[in-house]
């Protein structure tokens, strides 16, 4: 670089420049380039009246790729050949076609070379002529943007003799072909030129320089000591002296590396290295998809000679070759996580580009360039002073139809954007050389600093960053110190709290011991209660079983009773039927008997009739026959009659016997049936009686067992009641804890109240002190005013000392005594009033505290005296007793009463314990109240001490003031005596008084003009020394008559006194009055400061104690005039 600068300086002196091949490869950072005032040689065109040109828009449609062919996606785009300018879009759904017209349309048959010749070749000459040009590719992901702009960057061949000879691949894109063609054109146009390139990447809205090694970036970031480094590359609006802009105003990228290249090979190498660093990733749309925007900028400086003036000047041209990342559908591209975030930011920047295009087409007042860094970088290319062309890449497949339509619409709207291209400012060669020399000096300083190891060169921005970091470190250190101080205070507070905690821990341990005892008892009771509960449960289960058995037995008895009743009814019915049958048989037998009786009676009647007829016939026969035959027949008849009679009798007897047997049989059957039924009933009754006896015995046994179990259950219930008592005890303990917590909170509250009272008392005392100080200050100011007035009166006294000495003395005496008594009275009254107000405040605060404590006691006592636990026990007792009454016999009432008595005793014991706890808490509250009262008494005593101190200070100050005034009065009387001596000496005949100033009038006339002096009508209250001095003054002056109290006129002096004047009889201070020391105030007695103030000035720093300590040094530290200050006892 040093050799380059020397060569440039030699060229400047000789007027010739060497070939560009002699330049070494160099790099420069635009942030370090100085901004100098450059000499503008000329501008080919003025900004006003420049023609406007529309942005040129080219469309390139690729062929279907393998994925689209594999998915059998149809073609919806058709072009019109190599020289076509229209794109025809076919809608497969409706079959309609839409035609888009552009500057040029490249179909499937186009190649890279034709693209370069038709699009970018013309911009190389424009750049050499001094224009800024931009070419950027826009389109969907996977449509060939990177292929169109970069393509295949590898060099197929080169020549060592000619470094600008490069053989490119047929797939090389626009950028490598521009580099090769640029150097070929530059060799033909001029021999003196320079070319520099820059390569920027915009990834996730962050700029990155692709020409900088990653190691350098990591080292720069490491210098920030773990802090987030600032973005090294930033976008600014350039200064108006920028020569790369036609109007001196353009976008300026700070921190970007610009590499000087001497051949196309070096440019291709830089392009290849930067492309390898670019962010790429694989998606469903493309195997190698670009995930960032890149801007490859070529800047040329061409030296030419003005044809008229012969002056050398430099033309600066710039060509921006932009490869945009493709817009994509996240769902279709399959982007996830980081890829999805990248796609979102890419779409955001492209949407902002679309809004900028729409705003430019619509001629909006606001163009949203600053909403994205991409549009900010392309600000001059869109609607600015740059020649711009857009290459829109599209896909012909149907699956990409939406993105294709969007791209064609954007390209169509972009055609309407108009730019006003202008040639950049021309720069003189001398200013360029100066710029290079400054750059060389800067690099020398950096090199020197690196060799001497005195440090490294940093930019102003980094220096400010380091300074801000150092300030931040200092602030953090101050915060750390503050936090350490707070930590120290917190440690002290922590130690105090630790002490309190230890005390509380001791109390807690004592309570823990008591609680352990209670817990042990509660555990035993809990075990006992659990046993009782289990027994109760067993008893309940047993009772339920017995009840179920009884219910079953009752059901069985009911069933058996019903069956027996039915059987008895059936047997009774059977007996009744038998009785009916028997009764019927009896009736039938009776009827038969009656029939037989009737038959026998009829038979008897018949036999009687037969016998009568036979007798009649026999009589008739006998009459007619012979008697012999009659006898034989009669005997035969008698025999036959007897046989018949016997037969009838036997038959009747048989019948009667048969009837009797049948009746007896019926009776026997009836008796047997009755006896069998009775025996059957008796057996059933006996069985039922046996069952009932067994049931009664079982019930008795069960009742006995139940009674025993109930006794046990009563014991268990008594234990449960004891458990309830224990629970109540635990509740009381918890209640005690709550009361203790409440008491502790009340203690804290009262402690806070005491603290607030102390603070209020301190504030009140401070206010009263301030009021006393203000009143003392006002009194002192009043005294000072009176002193000033006294000084004025003294001057008047000096003017009329002879004529008005009596009146002045009496007036001064009365005025000073009144003022002193009034000031002291005011001070004393204000002090007493302040103390009374403090006492009233303290008493009111104490009274309010007592009221609060009494209210607290009133709130606590009902809680402590409440019998709600006893009520709960009573309710439990009644429930248990009701259950026992319902379930058991009256014999259990004695056991219940005993259990109730035990429960009552337990409740009373618990209530007594609760009352004891409440009494303890009352005693603690009383101790707190007593402590508070003692604290209030201490405050009262301190306030009384303060009052006594203030009043004593007032008395001491007043006494010292009175003593000081007595001394001053004595000095005044002595001075008056000396004045009388001088007057007496002047009155003597042979007096010769020498004066320094001649007097024109005679002394007698001057003396005659003086008023006569009179003695005071009321004797002065002076000390013994003052009276002695006054007597000496009377004795030394013959013309002063104490008896008359009147001075006589002085006689005429002897001698000529015209050349003399009497010396003034009043001593006058020969220097300004000194400052009176002001003592400490009451509130700052520990400090050793002393405040001073002038006697004649009313200082605001004079306080109550300033008079107390100043009187001791009054004589030595102050010079007074003869002030008539008198203190009246």
Swiss-Prot record:
GO biological process: 2-micrometer plasmid partitioning; cell division; initial mitotic spindle pole body separation; microtubule depolymerization; microtubule-based movement; mitotic spindle assembly; spindle elongation
Compositionally biased intervals (Polar residues): 11-21, 28-48
Coiled-coil positions: 422-513, 681-765, 919-948
Major subcellular location class: cytoplasm
All copies of domain Kinesin motor, residue ranges: 54-417
Region (Disordered): 1-49
Residues engaged in binding ATP: 139-146
Protein name in UniProt: Kinesin-like protein KIP1
GO molecular function: ATP binding; microtubule binding; plus-end-directed microtubule motor activity
InterPro entries on file: KIF11-like (IPR047149), KIF11-like_kin_motor_dom (IPR047241), Kinesin_motor_CS (IPR019821), Kinesin_motor_dom (IPR001752), Kinesin_motor_dom_sf (IPR036961), P-loop_NTPase (IPR027417)
Subcellular localization: Cytoplasm, Cytoskeleton, Spindle
Highest taxon of the lineage: Eukaryota
PANTHER family: KINESIN-LIKE PROTEIN KIF11, KINESIN-LIKE PROTEIN KIP1
Organism: Eremothecium gossypii (strain ATCC 10895 / CBS 109.51 / FGSC 9923 / NRRL Y-1056)
